[in-house]
Amino acid sequence: ARWVSHVELQKRQLLRAKENHRLNGLAVDDRNFVREDLYKHLRRAAKRDVEVDGIILDPPPMVPKRGAHLPPGQDYSTLVPLCAPRLAVGGWLLCFFHRRERTREEYEAEVVGASPVPLELLWQGTSGLDFPDDPQAKLRIAAFTRTG
C-alpha cells in the first residue's frame, strides 16, 4: 500500500495506534491518523468515490454516540454497505468479530449479505493462546475479497 489511514474516534486509541507504528519501526505521519467518526468518514469517501485495496473493520461492541449495545453483532449491517463499495475489485475486507451472541458463520453471513458488491470469504482465523479455549469465546477474524 502507498498509504494507510487509521480512522478512530477515541483519541486514546489513536495515540495507541501511533505508538504501535513507532514500536514496529514504521513511519508516523499524522495525516494517516484521522480522529473522526467512521460512519462520517466512509460517507465522505463515497462522495469522493475513493477506491482502496484493503479495509480492516474492528468495530467496538458498543457504538459511541448511540449509547446502547447493538442487537447481536457489531453494526456490520451498517458499516459493510458503506465500506465494501470502496474496495477495488480484488481488494480485501478484514473483519474482527468480538461479540459472542452469534456464531462466526452468522457474522460472516451478515457481512456478505449486507454488501452491495460481491464479497467472498477468503480466510478465517482466531485469536491466540491468550484467549479462552472455547472457540466461540475467542476473537474471530474473517477476510473477504471483492469479486466484482
Region spans (language model):
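Conserved SAM-binding motif I beta-strand of class I
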Residues: 3-8
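Glycine-rich loops and low-complexity Gly/Arg-rich segments
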Residues: 29-32, 57-59, 79-82, 118-121
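S-adenosylmethionine
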Residues: 37-113
